[in-house]
Amino acid sequence: MLQPKRRKYRKEQKGRNTGIATRGNAVSFGEFGLKAIGRGRLTARQIEAARRAMTRHIKRGGRIWIRIFPDKPISHKPAEVRMGNGKGNPEYYVAEIQPGKMLYEMDGVTEELAREAFRLAAAKLPLKTTFIVRQLGA
């Protein structure tokens, strides 16, 4: 699963996920893309599950790019532990997603195959997404 190799600090504050994606919002590598319309968090497990769904569908053909990386640690306190006594330990990592962010890209396959692969991947994600075709000259 995806997670940072090392971090300067183990824990991070919650923060607020606001605004729209101004970077990483265009198809840059492939011909087709899966773009987020909604806002939220994607865990490393969700990113991997969607990648597997796409890879299985396109079989040997094509190439997939993952345009997001889970770099924010989410901490949890153990069950039945009293309040206080500091912050919990990091349990998993998430990627904060703003509307307009490109999540995955694909190349080397037909549009129908890419559309179906992205539909299967989108079913694994807790966000609303849309299918994007690269525009010429963009």
UniProtKB/Swiss-Prot annotation:
GO BP of this protein: translation
PROSITE patterns for the chain: RIBOSOMAL_L16_1
GO molecular function: rRNA binding; structural constituent of ribosome; tRNA binding
Keyword Zinc appears in the UniProt entry: no
Biased composition (Basic residues): 1-13
Annotated Gene Ontology cellular component terms: cytosolic large ribosomal subunit
Keyword NAD on entry: no
Keywords of this entry: Ribonucleoprotein, Ribosomal protein, RNA-binding, rRNA-binding, tRNA-binding
Chain spans, region Disordered: 1-20
SUPFAM superfamilies (alphabetical): Ribosomal protein L16p/L10e
Protein function: Binds 23S rRNA and is also seen to make contacts with the A and possibly P site tRNAs.
Summary of subunit composition and partner proteins: Part of the 50S ribosomal subunit.
Family that this chain belongs to: Belongs to the universal ribosomal protein uL16 family.
Cross-referenced HAMAP family: Ribosomal_uL16 (MF_01342)
Protein name: Large ribosomal subunit protein uL16
Organism: Paraburkholderia xenovorans (strain LB400)
